[in-house]
């Protein structure tokens, strides 16, 4: 099994690349720049019977009634009853390339926000001088280096609309994913992976054949990725 690069290797690489020396504040002996590995959260696709006989009819899609059934679980920020304008097209070829560009554009638009991780904020950079003396960098340069490290390990959740099909209401749900097409560590070797998920309550059309076919809407929990972390 391939092991993750050690923290010592990470620090050595920073020294080589930046020509600087980094030491954690408070006399700590180890610098945890990277988050610990997390679960992959395998959110499997739902498998539906292809026979259209199990699809809801037009009379079963009364939006007023369905909104009443869903109640306060309806979240307009993550649910839609009609195709959202920014929903990426499926399929390969040009559509797939356009979707990749849209994903990259969304990634570039996001920047680290909130509180800077303590592991990065606590870094103290010093520049080696003659006779082994050290000199601390200016606050401005130190801040730039910290922001660079933060941006390299930043793992935002990328959201896109997903069509669940006619057997779910609302039919369109905004799902999350982690951008894993580039490494999120220095040196390279780790990628952004799902670390947390939340559940949306949606309605699912279910048919039972016992005593004749009977169908109806039932509430189900639909998981979506809510957090990504830099992991092995």
Curated annotation (Swiss-Prot):
GO terms for molecular function: cytokine binding; protein homodimerization activity. Residues 1-27 form the signal peptide. Disulfide bonds join 155-192, 178-228, 184-230, 207-215. Gene3D superfamilies: Cystine-knot cytokines, Helix hairpin bin. The keyword Electron transport does not apply. Its main location: secreted. Belongs to the noggin family. Homodimer. Interacts with GDF5; inhibits chondrocyte differentiation. It is linked to Symphalangism, proximal 1A: A disease characterized by the hereditary absence of the proximal interphalangeal joints. Distal interphalangeal joints are less frequently involved and metacarpophalangeal joints are rarely affected whereas carpal bone malformation and fusion are common. In the lower extremities, tarsal bone coalition is common. Conductive hearing loss is seen and is due to fusion of the stapes to the petrous part of the temporal bone. This is Noggin. It comes from Homo sapiens. The lineage of its organism: Eukaryota, Metazoa, Chordata, Craniata, Vertebrata.
């Amino acid at each position: 099994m391939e092991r993750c690069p050690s923290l010592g290797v990470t620090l050595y690489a920073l020294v080589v690349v930046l020509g600087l020396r980094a030491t954690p504040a408070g006399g700590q002996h180890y610098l945890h720049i990277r988050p610990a590995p997390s679960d992959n959260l395998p959110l499997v696709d739902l498998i539906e019977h292809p026979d259209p006989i199990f699809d809801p009819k037009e009379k079963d899609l009364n939006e007023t009634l369905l909104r009443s059934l869903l109640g306060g679980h309806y979240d307009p920020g993550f649910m839609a009853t009609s195709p959202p304008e920014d929903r990426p097209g499926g399929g390969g070829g040009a559509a797939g390339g356009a979707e990749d560009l849209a994903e990259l554009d969304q990634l570039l638009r996001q920047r680290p926000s909130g509180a800077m991780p303590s592991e990065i904020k606590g870094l103290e950079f010093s520049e080696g001088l003659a006779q082994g003396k050290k000199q601390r960098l200016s606050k401005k340069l130190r801040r730039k280096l910290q922001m660079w490290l933060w941006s390299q390990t930043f793992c935002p959740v990328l959201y896109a609309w997903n069509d669940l099909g006619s057997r779910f209401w609302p039919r369109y749900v905004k799902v999350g994913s982690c951008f894993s097409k580039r490494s999120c560590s220095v040196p390279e070797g780790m990628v952004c992976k799902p670390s947390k998920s939340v559940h949306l309550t949606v309605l699912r059309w279910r048919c039972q054949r016992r005593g004749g076919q009977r169908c109806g809407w039932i509430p189900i929990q639909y998981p979506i990725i809510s957090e990504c972390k830099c992991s092995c």
